[in-house]
Amino acid sequence: MHLLYFIKSCETDLSARLVTFDFQILFHLYANGPSPSMSVMAATNASLAAFVKTIKRMTEDGLLVVESGVEDRRVRNYDLAPPVRAMISALLTQHLGARAA
């Protein structure tokens, strides 16, 4: 998603946080699909404590689904809940056209 890279570039250049950790997590998972927790964390600029708090809240709120890894059950893979993925896709299509979704 070019939009996410643009926003991250602006944040770096301005030395300011422009979007929430929630936004970073949602759009990372939208663009990349199911991802291990450490990959999701790397897509944010959150500290470990802030990331754990945010991902826990988003899961409890039904925005994310989580599964244990197949090869290593300690690995937690996160993904968008299907209704959330559908909503983001619909909003992107509505505001940016079909190619954006």
List each language-model region with its residue ranges.
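Canonical helix-turn-helix DNA-binding module
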Residues: P34-R76
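N-terminal helix-turn-helix DNA-binding core of bacterial DNA-binding proteins
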Residues: S9-A46
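N-terminal leader segment of winged-helix/HTH proteins
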Residues: M1-A16, R76
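Short, cationic-aromatic polyanion-contact patches
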Residues: A16-F21, P36, G69-L92
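Amphipathic alpha-helical dimerization/coiled-coil segments
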Residues: Y5-E11, P82, A86-A101
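Generic leucine side-chain signal with a strong bias for well-ordered alpha-helical environments
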Residues: L26-L29, L63-L64, L80
